[in-house]
Each structure stands twice: as C-alpha cells, then as structure tokens.
Amino acid sequence: MDQDEALTTVDNIVTQFNTYEDFLDSQITTLDLYYLEDEGLARQLVELGYRGTGEVVKREDFEARKAAIEIARLAERTQKKTLTSAGKDLHDNFLKALAVREEDNRSGKSVIFIRDKNSHGQEVSGYIDYAHRLKTEDFEVYFSGKKRLLPRPTDMSFYNWDSHIAIWNSTPNYQVIADNPEGLLFKYKRDRKILNVDPKAQPGDNSTRSPILTELYTQVVIFDHVSRRKT
C-alpha cells in the first residue's frame, strides 16, 4: 500500500469512528472476547496488530488525522461564516451602508459617527469603531430592526449633550488623540495614519467621509479607511 492509499484508509477510519477505542472495538470479534475474557487485552492485541479483522492503524496516526480533519473543518466553517446582514430586507440607507461594510470590518475599516436621542430622550453622539463592535456584540438585533445602534461610553468617543459627559477610549484598531487643539483625531494602529473627523477638514490619507441620509437618526457619518500596510 502506497502513502496516498494509507492516508485515505486512515481518513476513512477517522471519519467512521469518534475515538480510537471505538475503532479498536470494531476489530474485536465475539470469539476474541470468549477466549481472552478481557476487553482491554483484546484492544491491546488489535493495536499491536495481533488481532483484528481490518487495517492496522497506530493510535498516534489516528489522533493526528482526527485533529487535522477537525482543524480543516473549523477553518472552512470560519471562511463560510454568514454575514449578519445576509438575507436581511434593509430599507434604511444607514443599515444598507452598514451591510455593505460588514465584511471589510471583520478586519477594521470604518468609524461611524452617530448623533441622536437615547431611550431617556437625551441627545448623545459619538464615534464607533465598527469592527470592534462587530467582534464584541451580535449585530443581528440592529440589522433586524429590534434595536438601534447608538454610541456608548465604551466606544471611541461618547458625549451626552444634556449631562455634558465626554468620554474617549482607544480600541484595538484606533488610538484616540483627544488633546489635539484643532479637534478630535484617530490614529489607525495598523498603518499609523491619522483620521481627521472635523467636517471642515479633509479626513486624511486613504480615508473618506460619507454622510448618510437616514430616517433612523438625527445625523450619521461613516469614515472609511483603507490600510496600505502589507500584512
């Protein structure tokens, strides 16, 4: 038997049996148990090749192939992971804009500015690291319309216009520069480019500013950044 045939045989066995012990048991006959009177001993003899009705497969080969097949299965499932926005009937421009950017933001691309009233009727605004929020919460509730995406005190920036509370937080993708005399800046950590969110200024290298007309919020602006750094 050549190497390819041997590998195919092991793969077939690994696919058929959950554990190595299950495979050994399949090779033991009723007659073996009658004469040996010990299931453990019967398994050992099959493993050593002295008993059995089929191919001899070493424990380490079985477990190695089992692990490799599982890793490949998980990798394939990750690659085929359905986007949260997939299949949703989205009518509002903001939700459509989020859906278009969802796949890119699995690696960190966009900053979302939102201004609107919270559940207490207070006006709040802030900048959201879209990629970070995607990783830390389920966006199903937003795309399905069950909840509205709003800035939180844990986002890149948060401001409550009633209480005048202002909070800034750096994220895995962006460093907040809050002490800039000309206004708030964000530095993209991957390529260290500056994103300027001042509406009167250019957003910066490799960045675009897109105001979104939406019926869900008072104001929405999405900043998209394209990293030129090789990864």
UniProtKB/Swiss-Prot annotation:
The keyword Amino-acid biosynthesis does not apply. Keywords: Cytoplasm, Nucleus. It comes from the Eukaryota. It is found in: Cytoplasm; Nucleus. One of its GO terms (cellular component) is cytoplasm. It holds the Pfam family DUF4464. Transmembrane segments: none annotated. The keyword Nuclease does not apply. May be involved in spermatogenesis. This is Cilia- and flagella-associated protein 299. The gene is CFAP299.
